[in-house]
Amino acid sequence: MEAARSGIEDVTSPDRISQLPNDLLFRILSLIPVSDAMSTSLLSKRWKSVWKMLPTLVYNENSCSNIGSLGFDQFCGRSLQLHEAPLLKTLTLELRKQTDSLDSSIFPNIHSTLLEFSIKSTGYPVYYSTISFPNNLDVFQTLVVLKLQGNICLDVVDSPVCFQSLKSLYLTCVNFENEESFSKLLSACPVLEDLFLQRLCSVGRFLFSISVPSLQRLTYTKEQAYYSNDEAILEITAPSLKHLNIFDRVGVFSFIEDMPKLVEASVRVKLSKNEKLPKVLTSVEHLSLDLYPSMVFHLDDRFISKQLLHLKLDIYDNFQSNLLLSLLKDLPNLQSLKLNHSHPSYNVEDQPCSVSEPSSVPECLSFHLETFQWIGYAGTFEEIAAAVYVLKNARCLKNATISLYSRGTENGLMMIKELESMSKGSIMCQLLVKF
């Protein structure tokens, strides 16, 4: 009674955390290493089975300091044997050392219905953890998402497996022993819809064949090559593809079939190596593309797209007005145009240019363009000519936003004044100049 009056809690009262619902306890335990979560089973009868029902398990080799003499693989395998949740939403393994026993020590001990499996290896780059997928394990039949990252070597030639439910596959810096391993992995995913590839690795110069009829989204990105022969060659057959994202200026991409369902694409490639690429982009509604001077030699009537509504152009080197205007005449239904000149390169003594205006105003300017955005506008003669032409001829333009790349306050103020004085073909146009 005295303790209650003084505001001191009775130490014999049940701990409040044990009264929390399981869902909240699961969230709390998911914030600590699995080895620590297992230790909570010693607290009381209430806690004995809480960790066994966790819907998410993250095994981090760097955080497992209290597993005694057990190796990391053995600890993972034994703890998974004790796990009782019928549904395991996510299982993550973060490896630090090389291991070749995942298929024998861990995979067979997963008894829950597993939806997402992630393996990340951060060991020394020279050493790879070899992963094989046994074909007699039910755990792979329920997987919806599979993520592999780091120093991992995949070998599926001798152990074919069927990921019959897999919808999303993420491969980041994963090594393949041969072309067949990559092809068999994809052929084992009959309902795959989302494929994310970042810097595929190989010993030698392989052809990576992507033949997935169900594929809807494909992303391939590549950082600066680590090795001189690290040049991707991808052969793509994906007739159901809707979204395409490629960022690799040295790779070669061959599209075997047309992709009539493609509606969105972001492409950062060297067109001189990928001359067939423009043909597969003719059905897109949203397109993000590099624009550089030499590109004019690789664009022709194959680039005409009546479906394109939104275009973003990343500009490199000096801006060329003629190249932009030649593109616009082939995009009759374009509604929004964004120019991003992040690092403009121009001579201080900008020389007057001769801009060849189209014989007729592009249809998109006369009837459809509503939004115009320019980032990195430096006020060169070429840029002024393009700005004047677009603002004057865009009859339906509602919003124009121009962000300046200026060499000084005085120069910036002059550009603002110049832009605001340009005539506008649309009475609805709201011009915003950012300095």
Swiss-Prot record:
Keyword tRNA processing: no
Domain F-box: 14-62
Family matches, as InterPro entries: F-box-like_dom_sf (IPR036047), F-box_AtFBL13-like (IPR053781), F-box_dom (IPR001810), FBD (IPR006566), FBL13/AtMIF1-like (IPR050232), LRR_dom_sf (IPR032675), LRR_FXL15/At3g58940/PEG3-like (IPR055411)
Domain of life of the organism encoding this protein: Eukaryota
Protein name, per record: Putative F-box/FBD/LRR-repeat protein At5g56810
Keywords: Leucine-rich repeat, Repeat
LRR repeats: from-to residues: 64-95, 146-173, 174-199, 222-248, 266-291, 316-341
Pfam families given in the database record: F-box, FBD, LRR_At5g56370
FBD domain mapped to chain residues: 353-404
